[in-house]
């Protein structure tokens, strides 16, 4: 199969770099999607489940551990001109950790806002919401940031296996109503469970459509 026809989620992904400041960003090239969410929302687990690789994104029981923008791309590309990966997934630092020092929070906010505002190749941010807790104030603050930066974002419920199945459609409807008037919000929400695999294909397809890739599995 030619390199350009590799299914997006049908072969391994690799970590290429952590970005502690904008100086370390890779050159703009392939389209990017980013994942944002509160500490311990299940962000790393969801990225690992998406690409079917348990150890790709580091998971931790320590909230606030990830303090960089972590870049992941499909393997098999040199990264040189003419052989770039088709897209990148960016794992953003978790937010909302109550014990994080103010200096750390300020640094995170500046890094994220500068990235959001200035990254032309960023196509969408997937904001993860823990289905057990719904939208919290920290989430609203980040949605405000995204609206201000005029970056398209889509909400994704995580850990739906932790709530009763009949509650999921109601939660989706309630959450959609809460963001209905937000200017940068994509109106269609997704629900996922990394543990059970629920909703992963829908999220894979959404990502592929966002970056303009037809062959995703």
Swiss-Prot record:
Annotated protein name in UniProt: Probable GTP-binding protein EngB
InterPro entries the record matches: G_ENGB_dom, GTP-bd, GTP-bd_ribosome_bio_YsxC, P-loop_NTPase
Binding residues for Mg(2+): 44, 66
Function in brief: Necessary for normal cell division and for the maintenance of normal septation.
Membership in a protein family: Belongs to the TRAFAC class TrmE-Era-EngA-EngB-Septin-like GTPase superfamily. EngB GTPase family.
Keywords assigned: Cell cycle, Cell division, GTP-binding, Magnesium, Metal-binding, Nucleotide-binding, Septation
Residue intervals of the EngB-type G domain: 29-213
GO BP term (any one): division septum assembly
Needed cofactors: Mg(2+)
GO molecular function: GTP binding; metal ion binding
Residues where GTP binds: 37-44, 64-68, 91-94, 158-161, 192-194
GO CC annotations, alphabetized: cytosol
